[in-house]
């Protein structure tokens, strides 16, 4: 069995996926490279049903959630792009499911145990709310932390300073008085050629 057989099997599998789940899928993108990964673009309303079907169907069996990645695009209406990386061990196939949201996404922690901490981290760093999550609370920052530090509109200096005070022998929270404007990245890079 050569590489061509393996690639044709992957392409067949991608076509099978699109046929089975066309009512859920908004768009399908296949990267033409050695991996032929499939990227499914899904509306947030159809997201949970698609993942549930992909996991439970005997034709797909995506039983492993590898990772969830978030990108913040503040200029868009649905500013957060979530990319879920799922694997089917039985069929030796990996799929990426992308959805866009401005506020919330259905939690898949009931389907994948590994999603619990990943979704908590996404909430803590970006502020994306996962509906029906059993324990959505901060996991990396302090419980009194204000804001979401990986959003592009979060100030580099933060909002408060946390330090240990030797005189009080306690941790002290003080508001920062540094003024910082919104970060705009509209400048020429020194690595780009000037025309």
Curated annotation (Swiss-Prot):
Keywords: Electron transport, Membrane, Mitochondrion, Mitochondrion inner membrane, NAD, Oxidoreductase, Respiratory chain, Translocase, Transport, Ubiquinone
Catalyses which reaction(s): a ubiquinone + NADH + 5 H(+)(in) = a ubiquinol + NAD(+) + 4 H(+)(out)
EC number: 7.1.1.2
Predominant place of localization: mitochondrion
A cellular component term, taken from the record's GO annotations: mitochondrial inner membrane
Top-level EC class: translocase
GO molecular function: NADH dehydrogenase (ubiquinone) activity
Compartments in which it is found: Mitochondrion inner membrane
Quaternary organization: Complex I is composed of about 30 different subunits.
HAMAP family given in the database record: NDH1_NuoC
Record-stated family: Belongs to the complex I 30 kDa subunit family.
Biological role stated in the UniProt entry: Core subunit of the mitochondrial membrane respiratory chain NADH dehydrogenase (Complex I) that is believed to belong to the minimal assembly required for catalysis. Complex I functions in the transfer of electrons from NADH to the respiratory chain. The immediate electron acceptor for the enzyme is believed to be ubiquinone.
Protein name: NADH-ubiquinone oxidoreductase subunit 9
Gene source species: Acanthamoeba castellanii (Amoeba)
Gene: NAD9
